[in-house]
């Protein structure tokens, strides 16, 4: 199936409305101020889930109770008073359905929606000054664990600034200022519409193609198989794909999900690990500055790279389909096809790993690396380990960079789709609900999967190309809060030392969430979710009988993932608007 460029990024919003991801932030943060009044919402979306389906702190107890929470569907607007029923009084107090909204940083009365969250005037001004003046605050004397409240918010400025970032205040919102309302609405409507169309096309295509394959296999069955009564066939199909209940032990659920996870994810990871030993990049190594140094000869295997890439017959066939494009193979088994600055990825399902990678020239000891890394004309970087490289060619347009970044997700997204289809009971959901779950949860699944790419001990991040970069190098390229938050999440998740089985079940729980926006048959999704959570609980209790807190810690990772999803959405939007 042909995938449109940029289509794999549309999981950043599962809402059909023209809405800004930057206006939606997760309430699921243990740093959020919620203690003053449990009945007062701190978001314009006064519901158990925002547009991306983010659970709030108050829902964590319900999540442990197999997520028996209420849901209210809300839609975002592009203006500051984004939710229906939200008003702003003459005194500057923001209210929602008659209830006063509180500042997410200090708990004071919020004056409005500032820099991505509801905040008071004090915290709004504090955050703006901190960013604009690049203030370095005095080190906290309490290990950066100060509790920020209205009465003591000026006591520790470092912790206050940290709290601003943790609840979702956006540096970019301060840096870029305001976009005219009409222009912002036009851009958002245009972008969201295109993203939704392409995403629906991609996910629906994956699911429909799988259905066609199954139909073809069924027609190829022996005659005696085709002549069997339909009710019997239907009964067996239902039995094999329905959510396991009393007929299936929880151990069988665990086994099925673990096999699905291993077959779709772990193989590629092992390939990457095996190749990393022989192709370990040196510190400071980089992608070639000018990709045009390779000969674009259309008549040779690898399109001018035959001297470096010995190719098989299947690879020759692949190159014939994409004639006129450079094809480079990276250690994780993905072939990057470069054509006129655009990238397309092909996973191991399409091509064999039979090509060696061209050695990449590194920096000399005396070369000024920072001047090279930052010489992009002041443009933004998409420094995200889910792209093939943090390097941004200064000669490429923002549109080209966006397409490259989008297409780098294609193999990973396809693996998520394949994993989802093998979760017992997932295929029984309506195709509409399957697509919505995949759109809303793909980034979070990838975040769990790629947590192993973050090495807290070495302070390095491995990108999808298989190359490692130090955190300091990435910061010099423009990496900011998103990378820091991803690193922090990965460090905490890796610290739990989950087994393959536990990671598989947790990944399934992350994907199948009944509180996602746009779900039609909530009861069916909730039943499947309940089955998976019970299986995860059983597995954790079995493997860690003396560490019951691990299950709770895993559930607490769900709102953290929602926050990361929103931050990622905001960064993508900021890049799209200001490349």
From Swiss-Prot:
Annotated GO CC locations: chromatin; cytoplasm; nucleoplasm; nucleus
Region: Modulating, residue numbers: 1-99
Subcellular location, record wording: Nucleus; Cytoplasm
Primary location group: nucleus
GO MF: DNA-binding transcription factor activity, RNA polymerase II-specific; DNA-binding transcription repressor activity, RNA polymerase II-specific; nuclear receptor activity; RNA polymerase II cis-regulatory region sequence-specific DNA binding; sequence-specific double-stranded DNA binding; zinc ion binding
Post-translational modifications reported in the UniProt record: Deacetylated by HDAC1. Acetylation and deacetylation regulate its transcriptional regulatory activity. Under more reducing intracellular redox conditions, Cys-384 is in its heme-bound state, which is optimal for recruitment of the NCOR1/HDAC3 corepressor complex and repression of target genes. When subjected to oxidative stress conditions, Cys-384 undergoes oxidation to form a disulfide bridge with Cys-374, also triggering a ligand switch that results in release of bound heme and derepression of target genes.
CDD domains: NR_DBD_REV_ERB, NR_LBD_REV_ERB
Stretch list, region Disordered: 13-61, 222-250
Residues in NR LBD domain copies: 369-579
ZnF (NR C4-type) residues: 103-123, 140-164
DNA-binding region(s) in UniProt: 100-176
Regions of compositional bias (Low complexity) in chain numbering: 13-54
Tissues/organs with expression: Widely expressed. Expressed at high levels in the liver, adipose tissue, skeletal muscle and brain. Expression oscillates diurnally in the suprachiasmatic nucleus (SCN) of the hypothalamus as well as in peripheral tissues.
A GO biological process held by the record: positive regulation of DNA-templated transcription
Disulfide bonds: 337-343, 374-384
Region annotation (Interaction with ZNHIT1) ranges: 397-579
Record note on domains: Composed of three domains: a modulating N-terminal domain, a DNA-binding domain and a C-terminal ligand-binding domain.
Assembly mode: Binds DNA as a monomer or a homodimer. Interacts with NCOA5 coactivator, leading to a strong increase of transcription of target genes. Interacts (via N-terminus) with KAT5. Interacts (via C-terminus) with HDAC1. Interacts with ZNHIT1. Interacts with SIAH2.
PANTHER family per the UniProt record, alphabetical: NUCLEAR HORMONE RECEPTOR, NUCLEAR RECEPTOR SUBFAMILY 1 GROUP D MEMBER 2
Function recorded in the entry: Transcriptional repressor which coordinates circadian rhythm and metabolic pathways in a heme-dependent manner. Integral component of the complex transcription machinery that governs circadian rhythmicity and forms a critical negative limb of the circadian clock by directly repressing the expression of core clock components BMAL1 and CLOCK. Also regulates genes involved in metabolic functions, including lipid metabolism and the inflammatory response. Acts as a receptor for heme which stimulates its interaction with the NCOR1/HDAC3 corepressor complex, enhancing transcriptional repression.
Protein name: Nuclear receptor subfamily 1 group D member 2
Organism field: Homo sapiens
């Amino acid at each position: 199936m042909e995938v449109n460029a940029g289509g794999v990024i549309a999981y950043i919003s599962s809402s059909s409305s023209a809405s800004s991801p930057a206006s939606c932030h997760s309430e699921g943060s243990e740093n959020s101020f919620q203690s003053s009044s449990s009945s007062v919402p701190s978001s314009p979306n006064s519901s158990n889930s925002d547009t991306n389906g983010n659970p709030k702190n108050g829902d964590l107890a319900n999540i442990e109770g197999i997520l028996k929470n209420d849901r209210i569907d809300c839609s975002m607007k592009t203006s500051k008073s984004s939710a229906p029923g939200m008003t702003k009084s003459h005194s500057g107090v923001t209210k929602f359905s008659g209830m006063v909204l509180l500042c997410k940083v200090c708990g004071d009365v919020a004056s409005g929606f500032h820099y991505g969250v509801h905040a008071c005037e004090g915290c709004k001004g504090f955050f703006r000054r901190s960013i604009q003046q690049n203030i370095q605050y005095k080190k906290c004397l309490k290990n950066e664990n100060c509790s920020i409240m209205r009465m003591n918010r000026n006591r520790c400025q470092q912790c206050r600034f940290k709290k601003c970032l943790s609840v979702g205040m956006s540096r970019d919102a301060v840096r870029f200022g305001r976009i005219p309302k009409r222009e912002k609405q036009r851009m958002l409507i245009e972008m969201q519409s295109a993203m939704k169309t392409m995403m629906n096309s991609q996910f629906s295509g994956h699911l429909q193609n799988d259905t066609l394959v199954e139909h073809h296999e069924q027609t190829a069955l022996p005659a005696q198989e085709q002549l069997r009564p339909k009710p019997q066939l239907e009964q067996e199909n239902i039995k094999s794909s329905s959510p396991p209940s009393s007929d299936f032990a929880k151990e069988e659920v665990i086994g099925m999900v673990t096999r699905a996870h291993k077959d779709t994810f772990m193989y590629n990871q092992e390939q990457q690990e095996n190749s990393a030993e022989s192709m370990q990049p040196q510190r400071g190594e980089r992608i070639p500055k000018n990709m045009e140094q390779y000969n674009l000869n259309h008549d040779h295997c690898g399109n001018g790279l035959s001297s470096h890439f010995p190719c098989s017959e299947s690879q020759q066939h692949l190159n014939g389909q994409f004639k006129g494009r450079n094809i480079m193979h990276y250690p994780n088994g993905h072939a990057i096809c470069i054509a006129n600055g655009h990238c397309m990825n092909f996973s191991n399902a399409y091509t064999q790993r039979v090509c060696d990678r061209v050695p990449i020239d590194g920096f000399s000891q005396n070369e000024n690396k920072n001047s090279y890394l930052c010489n992009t004309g002041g443009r933004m970087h998409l420094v995200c380990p889910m792209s093939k490289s943090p390097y941004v060619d200064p000669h490429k347009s923002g549109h080209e960079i966006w397409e490259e970044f989008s297409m780098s997700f294609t193999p990973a997204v396809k693996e998520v789709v394949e994993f989802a289809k093998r979760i017992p009971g997932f295929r029984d959901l309506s195709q509409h609900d399957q697509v919505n779950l995949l759109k809303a949860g793909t980034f979070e699944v990838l975040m769990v999967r790629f947590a192993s790419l973050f090495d807290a001990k070495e302070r390095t991040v491995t990108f999808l190309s298989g190359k490692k970069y130090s955190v300091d190098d990435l910061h010099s390229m423009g990496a900011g809060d998103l990378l820091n938050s991803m690193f922090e999440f990965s460090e905490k998740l890796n610290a739990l030392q989950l087994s393959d089985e536990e990671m598989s079940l947790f990944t399934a729980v992350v994907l199948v969430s009944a509180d996602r926006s746009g779900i039609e048959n909530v009861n069916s999704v909730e039943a499947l979710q309940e089955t998976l959570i019970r299986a995860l609980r059983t597995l954790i209790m079995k493997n860690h009988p003396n560490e019951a807190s691990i299950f709770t810690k895993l559930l607490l990772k769900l709102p953290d993932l929602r926050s990361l999803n929103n931050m990622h959405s905001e960064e993508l939007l900021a890049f799209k608007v200001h490349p």
